[in-house]
Curated annotation (Swiss-Prot):
PROSITE patterns: TYR_PHOSPHATASE_1, TYR_PHOSPHATASE_2, TYR_PHOSPHATASE_PTP. This is Tyrosine-protein phosphatase non-receptor type 5. Belongs to the protein-tyrosine phosphatase family. Non-receptor class subfamily. May regulate the activity of several effector molecules involved in synaptic plasticity and neuronal cell survival, including MAPKs, Src family kinases and NMDA receptors. It comes from the Eukaryota. Residues 276-531 form the Tyrosine-protein phosphatase domain. It comes from Mus musculus. The modification Phosphothreonine is found at T231. One of its GO terms (molecular function) is protein tyrosine phosphatase activity. The chain crosses the membrane at residues 64-84, 122-142. Phosphorylation at Ser-221 by PKA deactivates PTPN5. Phosphorylation at Thr-231 and Ser-244 by MAPKs stabilizes the phosphatase, dephosphorylation of these sites results in ubiquitin-mediated degradation of the active phosphatase.
Length: 541
């Protein structure tokens, strides 16, 4: 059956004339209308399909329906295995029913004519569809399910929230790489205990209130300090204090912990933040329980009420009234130096208004030749009182006169003279200004340069130099970084190795919380790695 017989009733195409021939004809012939279309017969003849066509061939329409059905079954199988098959099957069935209803009303379409496919075409379509179905099912079955994230063990909870350092390896050298700087939130110098204490103004020594706080709420300033109110071994009645097993174990750790690092080990460890983080959190803080101090009015002498001097090493001021323990109190500790030498440094808090006179009493009493200040006057809030004069001031009979101020890129050096009666002394005051607010420096060379300058100034004082006073705001974070860097530089020069872990433990024995944050602990390792490289270059030259 030919196509012209099937498509009866449709207008037949008119044969178009060539342009050349049409131009040569008379105008009357050009305007002749086309012959009228033949009228459709009243009863179109219907031809039967060829014998055997239904059993050995497949129409285009049926082939497309078969292909669509196979794809539908494939999608059903995949979605059924994934758990969404039931709802998807119902929705798709409704859609197909609606589509078939619309197609039935459209009538025959020219391209779905009587064309047939032979058996080879049918086999090719079936083979292709089967191959697609089998490949998809095998891929779905062989695909490994995603592994659920492993929960962190309880002891790693604190490590998981630790900040990344605000410096990179490329920033240890003198050149700065702008792309390496990380914009991080502020790191508070805050010890970690179990609950949070709300601190009243310094003039109001009222009772303290305790409330629960999440970790993110603690990340403020040093005012939001924490306090363990349930220390094992603490006697609730009275002020008696017993050493708990936990504290005894912490004391043993501080005495025995050590990890000697050679040059290559130091460089590798400085680049491993996870190892440094795990090591830092193993070191006990060794903070002082406030119950150890039963001194009325002590709150007026401390900048932060939970950062107190460890009793065995604290500095005691000479006082004309031995019955008044408050007059001899200052929040400061003697710190041992390289090889355990006693009273090499004094770590203290940044003076407040009520302790400026006590601070200068300590400077005169200890015959201090050098003061190192590593904080700004204000960083979000007050960190230190400006305890030195513009020109001259007198505190407790000590006349303090600023002779000269030297400005450098990273610090300011004040040459100060002290006079009491007929005795006169000289004092160097280094104010390190390159430590950024609430985080560690981006570069280590400025701190190493300051350490070298202070060491040279101390050597000029002779072999028996009096203690060097170092302070920041609380007297434990940046102060600990400076003292640890100074001690480790001496060890690296003399022994060729360095033990930062042992140095940190020694500092915390003398004053709790020294090197206060993990970021500061990493920074000390980076500074020492850079210093070792500098020593290697000098020796090779």
């Amino acid at each position: 059956m030919c196509c012209s017989e099937r498509l009866l009733g449709l207008p037949q195409p008119v044969e178009m004339e060539a342009p050349d021939e049409a131009e040569g004809l008379p105008s009357k012939q050009k305007e002749m209308p086309p012959p009228p279309p033949p009228s459709p017969p009243s009863e179109p003849a219907q031809k039967l399909p060829p014998q055997g066509a239904g059993s050995h061939s497949l129409t285009v329409r049926s082939s497309l329906c078969l292909f669509a059905a196979s794809q539908f079954l494939l999608a059903c199988g995949v979605l059924w295995l994934s758990g969404h098959g039931h709802s998807w099957l119902q929705n798709t069935t409704d859609l197909i029913s609606s589509s078939l209803t619309v197609l039935n009303h459209l009538g025959p379409v020219a391209w779905l004519g009587s064309g047939t496919w032979g058996i080879p075409s049918l086999l090719l379509v079936s083979l292709t569809v089967s191959l697609v179905i089998v490949t998809t099912l095998v891929w779905h079955l062989l695909k490994a399910p995603p592994e659920p994230p492993a929960p962190l063990p309880p002891e790693d909870r604190r490590q998981s929230v630790s900040r990344q350092p605000s410096f990179t390896y490329s920033e240890w050298m003198e050149e700065k790489v702008e792309d390496d700087f990380l914009d991080l939130d502020a790191v508070p110098e805050t010890p970690v205990f179990d609950c949070v204490m709300d601190i009243k103004p310094e003039t109001d020594p009222a009772s303290l209130t305790v409330k629960s706080m999440g970790l993110q709420e603690r990340r403020g300033s040093n005012v939001s300090l924490t306090l363990d109110m349930c220390t094992p071994g603490c006697n609730e009645e009275g002020f008696g204090y017993l050493v708990s097993p936990r504290e005894e174990s912490a004391h043993e750790y501080l005495l025995s912990a050590s990890r000697v690092l050679r040059a290559e080990e130091l460089h590798e460890k400085a680049l491993d933040p996870f190892l440094l983080q795990a090591e830092f959190f193993e070191i006990p803080m060794n903070f002082v329980d406030p119950k150890e101090y039963d001194i009325p009015g002590l709150v007026r002498k401390n900048r932060y009420k939970t950062i107190l001097p460890n009793p065995h090493s604290r500095v005691r001021l000479t006082s004309p009234d031995p019955e008044d323990p408050l007059s001899s109190y200052i929040n400061a500790n003697y710190i041992r130096g390289y090889s355990g030498e006693e009273k090499v440094y004094i770590a203290t808090q940044g003076p407040i208004v009520s302790t400026v006179a006590d601070f200068w009493r300590m400077v005169w009493q200890e015959r201090t030749p050098i003061i190192v200040m590593i904080t700004n006057i204000e960083e979000m809030n007050e960190k230190c009182t400006e305890y030195w004069p513009e020109e001259q001031v007198v505190h407790d009979g000590v006349e303090i006169t600023v002779q000269k101020v030297i400005h450098t890129e990273d610090y300011r050096l004040r040459l100060i003279s002290l006079r009491r009666g007929t005795e006169e002394r000289s004092l160097k005051h280094y104010w390190f200004t390159s430590w950024p607010d609430q985080k560690t420096p981006d570069r280590a060379p400025p701190l190493l340069h300051l350490v070298r300058e202070v060491e040279e100034a101390a050597q000029q004082e002779g072999p028996h130099c009096s203690p060097i006073i170092v302070h920041c705001s609380a007297g434990i974070g940046r102060t600990g970084c400076f003292i640890a860097t100074s001690i480790c530089c001496q060890q690296l020069r003399r022994e060729g190795v360095v033990d930062i872990l042992k140095t940190t433990c020694q500092l915390r024995q003398d004053r709790g919380g020294m090197i206060q944050t993990c970021e500061q602990y990493q920074f000390v390792h980076h500074a020492m790695s850079l210093y070792e490289k500098q020593l290697s270059l000098q020796s090779s030259e």
